[in-house]
Amino acid sequence: MRIVFAGTPEFAAEHLKALLDTPHQLVAVYTQPDRPAGRGQKLMPSAVKSLALEHGLPVIQPPSLRSADAQAELAALRPDLMVVVAYGLILPQAVLDIPRLGCINSHASLLPRWRGAAPIQRAVEAGDAQSGVTVMQMEAGLDTGPMLLKVATPIAADDSGGSLHDRLAALGPKAVVEAIAGLAAGTLRGEVQDDALATYAHKLNKDEARLDWSRPAVELERQVRAFTPWPVCHSSLAGASLKVLGASLGHGSGTPGSILEASRDGLLVACGEGALRLTRLQLPGGKPLAFADLYNSRREQFAAGQVLGQ
């Protein structure tokens, strides 16, 4: 089959790698325009673009697919199928209609739960027992199309957004390759999603990563895991920023945000319900460290009675 691939981040690049190992012809790779990154704000290619160029694949980077010219360029490729993974651009119906077999998408959740931009982190944050990958036939709605294939994986008690991402990035490509084989053979039939079961995974932002100590400790512990490695939960102590990259549930009570105890086991902080033990922190200008290492050199900085987030 003649396949056009569309994707941008590393999660998508893993899918492109899998397609490179199939007999199908990759006629073009679509990815978002290069973006400024790093301290120098130098324009950097996406993970998908870098991989595509390594393998000599044509790369197309339109700012939008809404224009007639962009759609004509895609149609000229005569694709049988378009595979879309975390592309980041809206595909209008006119684009979805161009490939002979339409467009399929690998989405990092068990649809219809967690439609939207941040399904991996929202699943961890919500305390879901499992996550997975759904390969669906795309339609104009956001992640609403018929489901072709689903693969599930348990969410462990210590899973972070990063660890679950990596696991799904390994499961997704295999599911897409299997779905393409089924479509080519005409043996795959889509299952309509039940909209009544749908939830929406809103895009992450740095503002919501600020820890609200009035919330229950069990919720904050999940939030810390979900938001690692990005956007990283944070608070403040004595006016200085404090990034929280590891935490566990503790015992104790007090004014929300107050330090109950500091030891090599962690910094115990009172929450609206229960207490959270901070086990891995990053101070301004420093690198992430186990709290035991910070305690050895800065124990006076974490004296009990101080309040975080003020």
From Swiss-Prot:
The keyword Ribosomal protein does not apply. Belongs to the Fmt family. InterPro entries: Fmt, Formyl_trans_C, Formyl_trans_C_sf, Formyl_transf_N, Formyl_transf_N_sf, Formyl_transferase-like_C_sf, GART_AS, Met-tRNA-FMT_C. Its EC number is 2.1.2.9. (6S)-5,6,7,8-tetrahydrofolate binds at residues 109-112. It catalyses: L-methionyl-tRNA(fMet) + (6R)-10-formyltetrahydrofolate = N-formyl-L-methionyl-tRNA(fMet) + (6S)-5,6,7,8-tetrahydrofolate + H(+). SUPFAM superfamilies: FMT C-terminal domain-like, Formyltransferase. It is an enzyme of class 2 (transferase). Keywords: Protein biosynthesis, Transferase. GO terms for cellular component: cytosol. Attaches a formyl group to the free amino group of methionyl-tRNA(fMet). The formyl group appears to play a dual role in the initiator identity of N-formylmethionyl-tRNA by promoting its recognition by IF2 and preventing the misappropriation of this tRNA by the elongation apparatus. The keyword Transport does not apply. NCBIfam families: fmt. This is Methionyl-tRNA formyltransferase. GO terms for molecular function: methionyl-tRNA formyltransferase activity. Signal peptide: none annotated.
